[in-house]
Amino acid sequence: MATSIPIRNRAKHTGSPRSRAKSNVAVVGGRIDLPWGVALRELTCIADHRGSLVELDRHSWHPDDVSVQWTLSRSAPDVLRGPHLHKQHADRLVVLDGELLIGLVDLRRDSATARLRSSFVLAPLHVLTIPPGVLHAFFSQTATTALNGTSHEFDPADDLEVRFDDPDLGLVWPTGAPLLSPRDDDAPTLTVLLERCTAAGLRVIDPPR
């Protein structure tokens, strides 16, 4: 079943010598259902007069899904990374500064949430885990710095792109002309991607008719 997440209000710093501050996840429509296997963990910020400390990851949180590569990205406003689909690796995304509009589509044929679409704003102090087979894209609402951990080292053959404005995706972005990489700008339609995945033996949903 899908995981349902409510909006959380942004907690304010109390000004005390030692406080635990949490930020919000702004969810489109008030609540959001996440595809099966997608996880959102809220982090704790320990702050005092010296600064702050945040644990971003622990092996005990996901002992069977360890990140072997971490990548830092900085994005200008209106940058869209994706949509991408991975056959093998899982992503673990942390926003360090700014915020990202996240778009997800479950393309796994055997998933309990196949075809489910989700959209929400990811702010700091949360870790978003996305399993293989869930299409995802990240749009920078503001200048944004993010850290992405992956379960496998980067392999271009495992990074499949889709046109961001393909109506069959059902994902809506704040602008019709985002800043894209050349590879994302030349991406195929969802139908073409699904046909290629099926030909390669991957169990994905049927192409739209």
Segments from the language model and where they lie:
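Conserved metal-binding segment of the jelly-roll/cupin
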Residues: V121-T142
